[in-house]
From Swiss-Prot:
The lineage of its organism: Bacteria, Bacillati, Bacillota, Bacilli, Lactobacillales. Residues 356-449 form the HD domain. Belongs to the RNase Y family. Its main location: membrane. It is a single-pass membrane protein. Gene3D superfamilies: Hypothetical protein af1432 (1.10.3210.10), K Homology domain, type 1 (3.30.1370.10). It holds the Pfam family HD. HAMAP family: RNase_Y. Residues 230-293 form the KH domain. It is found in: Cell membrane. This is Ribonuclease Y. GO terms for biological process: mRNA catabolic process. GO terms for cellular component: plasma membrane.
Length: 540
């Protein structure tokens, strides 16, 4: 029984041992397999880690290289930016240096120009001093010659008186009379020579200054010559327009004439209407209004009044603009607006065919140039020259001469006293209180006498020529007189038996004085006296 029990137990123990060994063997194999797999996996992981490490190292190396490259590029870019900034800075510095050099150069040029101007003025002053010295020397020389001649004349008179008294046993008074009669011709000759010499000296001195003034001023302003007229012509598209201008029972033309103050002349002349009136501003307003009415086509009293008002406003604006333009051209900045408007009216005023506004501008420039040459107030001189004929703008509206009206306007609008005196004295009506007034007279004469500056009507022209010849013929010894060169020269033919060569100069001087006293004329008149004596002998 015990064997029966031990056998199963032994079998069980053996089974357990066999199972344990088999299990251990199986587990050992499994463990070995797992260990091999683990070792394989470890190797694989290690290889993968190594490859990843290498990849990381390569990536790090590439990143490091890229960073180095980026750093180098950034460094280069910074260097380039710095170089560019340095270049720009250098350019700015160079530009500033160039600008400063140019400014220094300009200042040097201005200084050189001022030095040249000062040197020029110094040379002019030296020339004037030398001229004055020469003139003083000449005057002293002439005075010495005159004194010497007077002494010689007294000596000759004494000698001849004594000789005649001794020879002819005449009284002293009779001898003196004979001597004085004989010396008369000689004294006349000496007087003529002195007049001629003085004229030549004055002319030689004045020519240079006159040329300079005329070149400086007249070349910068040339006033056109226009024909003085009292009519304006308006062209019509056709003759049918004349009836529309006249209107029913003449109401249109009557309304137009009443509003404008001009006469409308409609005659047989084809396609034209004539506007007649002495006031050029009214004629201009009427012309503009009529031209607009013709263009518009609607012509009736209400439309006429509208167009006339519009034309009057336009002309008034043009007048003010003309006055402002004259002030700007001469550099005058302050003037009463009403005086500017009155000045602009001179645009429509003429004198001997010369536009008065252009003439006034020219006189202003000439006066300014001469004042600057003499060291006077140039601004006041220009102002006085511009306003010297201001009275002519309204002399047909207000009683009085243009000089009186100009003086009243200048005082009313508070012009300087020197300007008022220059206006009042430019026709020698009152004494001149300053050199500027003298310069205005000279500039007015130069502008008026400039060739082509003025003209006159045919009737006045013929009357002036006749008066010129009559004055010349009224002197003793004159045989014939001819006015030539449009009345700018009078040639006088004298009888050689009655007028000596010495007396021709005195005769020319006397005729010149009478012309200045008795006549009014534009510009200058040259007096030429011609004495001719012929001796004829016939050989047979």
């Amino acid at each position: 029984m015990i064997n029966t029990i031990l056998v199963p137990v032994a079998v069980a123990i053996v089974s357990v041992l066999v199972g344990g060994c088999a299990g251990y063997s199986l587990r050992k194999n499994k463990w070995e397999t797992q260990a091999q797999n683990a070792a394989h996996d470890a190797k694989h992981i290690l290889a993968d880690a190594e490859s990843k490490a290498k990849a990381v190292e390569a990536d790090l190396a590439s990143q490091q290289e890229a960073m180095k490259k980026a750093a180098a590029d950034a460094k280069k870019e910074k260097i380039l930016e710095a170089q560019e900034e340095i270049h720009h800075y250098r350019e700015r510095v160079d530009n500033e240096l160039n600008e400063r050099r140019q400014e220094v150069s300009r200042q040097e040029n201005r200084l050189l120009q001022r030095e040249d101007a000062i040197d020029h003025k110094d040379s002019l002053l030296d020339q004037k001093d030398s001229q004055l010295t020469q003139k003083e020397n000449q005057i002293k020389k002439l005075q010495a010659q005159v004194l010497e001649k007077e002494k010689r004349a007294d000596q000759l008179v004494t000698e001849r008186e004594q000789k005649l008294y001794e020879v002819a046993e005449l009284s002293q008074e009779d001898a003196k009379k004979i001597v004085l009669d004989k010396l008369s011709d000689q004294l006349v000759k000496e007087r003529a020579e002195m007049i001629e010499e003085s004229n030549q000296l004055a002319k030689a001195k004045a020519d240079h200054f006159a040329r300079k003034v005329i070149v400086d001023a007249i070349q910068s302003s040339a006033a056109d010559t226009v024909s003085e007229k009292t009519v304006s012509v308006v062209n019509l598209p056709n003759d049918d327009m004349k009836g529309r201008i006249i209107g029913r029972e003449g109401r249109n033309i009557r309304s137009f004439e009443a509003l404008t103050g001009v006469d409308v002349i409609i005659d047989d002349t084809p396609d034209v209407v004539v506007l007649s009136g002495f006031d050029p501003i009214r004629r201009e307003i009427a012309k503009r209004a009529l031209e607009r009415l013709i263009k518009d086509g609607r012509i009736h009293p209400a439309r006429i009044e509208e167009m006339v008002d519009r034309a009057r406003k336009e002309v008034n604006d043009d007048i003010y603009e003309a006055g402002e333009s004259a002030l700007m051209e001469l550099g005058i900045h302050k003037m009463h607006p009403e005086l500017v408007k009155i000045l602009g009216r001179l645009k429509y005023r003429t004198s001997y065919g010369q536009n008065v506004l252009s003439h006034s501008i020219e006189v202003g420039k000439l006066t300014g140039v001469m004042a600057a040459e003499l060291g006077l107030d140039e601004k006041i001189a220009v102002r006085a020259g511009l306003l010297h004929d201001i009275g002519k703008s309204i002399d047909h509206e207000i009683e009085g001469s243009h000089v009186e009206i100009g003086v009243e306007l200048a005082r009313k609008y508070h012009e300087p006293d020197l300007v008022v005196n220059a206006i009042a004295a430019h026709h020698d009506d009152v004494p001149k209180l300053s050199f500027i007034a003298e310069l205005v007279v000279a500039a007015d004469t130069i502008s008026s006498a400039r060739p082509g500056a003025r003209s006159e009507s045919l009737e006045n022209y013929i009357r002036r020529l006749e008066q010129l010849e009559t004055i010349a013929k009224g002197h003793i010894g004159v045989k014939q007189a001819y006015a030539i060169q449009a009345g700018r020269e009078i040639r006088v033919m004298v009888e050689p038996d009655k007028i000596s060569d010495a007396r021709t100069t005195i005769l020319a001087h006397d005729i010149k004085n009478q012309i200045e006293q008795d006549m009014e004329y534009p510009g200058n008149i040259k007096v030429t006296v011609i004495r001719e004596k012929r001796a004829v002998a016939i050989a047979k």
